């Protein structure tokens, strides 16, 4: 048995480490996490408070952006002056329900890689190139196509759980104030 409240969670020791690590530098900071601090993390609000408090303490936008990728989606949003960017998966979008994968791959592949049953792969890997200078963070994304049957073929909506169902990583420019 696993307590679901302990999944997608930053423990108190890590929260304290983050707080102290941010205080220890006068440089701009970029965070990378698997789980989405803005939506999915059970105590994401506690993490965001640490980031926002550090920006308030120093009086400038020290914490610039937080990247994550767990949701296999693509979006950027601002919360209290900090950008949160969900970087799409390199190879597939997770649907969480059967996706007629038997139409994509032979039985032996589906049997060997059972996660394929609940996902829709891309025809080529996605990636992003991120550059940062004193004025901005620039993300140059990439795109692909869904391998058929596509979400549209499966009569799926454009988003699942509020997360865009896409085969791309968008180009984004985030100004650093």
Question: Model-found features: residue ranges?
Answer:
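Short, well-ordered beta-strand micro-motif
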Residues: 1, 19, 129-131
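Binuclear metal-dependent phosphoesterase catalytic core
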Residues: 74-177
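Residue-level detector of alpha-helix boundaries and kinks
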Residues: 2-3, 115
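His/acidic metal-ligating clusters that form di-metal
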Residues: 5-85
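Surface-exposed beta-strand edges and their flanking turn/coil or helix-capping segments
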Residues: 3-6, 14-15, 44, 97-100, ...
């Amino acid at each position: 048995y696993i307590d679901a409240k302990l999944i997608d969670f930053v423990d108190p020791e890590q929260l304290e480490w983050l707080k102290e690590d941010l205080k220890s530098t006068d440089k701009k900071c970029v965070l990378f996490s698997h789980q989405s601090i803005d939506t999915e993390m059970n105590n994401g609000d506690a993490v965001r408070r640490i980031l926002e408090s550090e920006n308030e303490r120093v009086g400038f936008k020290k914490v610039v952006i937080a990247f994550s990728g767990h949701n296999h989606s693509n979006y950027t949003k601002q919360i209290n002056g900090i950008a949160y960017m969900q970087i799409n998966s390199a190879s597939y979008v997770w649907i969480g329900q059967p996706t007629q994968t038997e139409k994509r791959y032979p039985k032996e592949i589906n049997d060997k890689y059972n996660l394929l049953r609940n996902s829709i792969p891309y025809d080529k890997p996605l990636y992003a190139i991120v550059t940062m200078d004193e004025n901005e963070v620039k993300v140059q994304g990439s795109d692909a196509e869904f391998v058929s049957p596509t979400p549209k073929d499966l009569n799926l909506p454009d988003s699942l759980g509020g997360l865009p169902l896409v085969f791309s990583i968008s180009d984004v420019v985030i100004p650093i104030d």
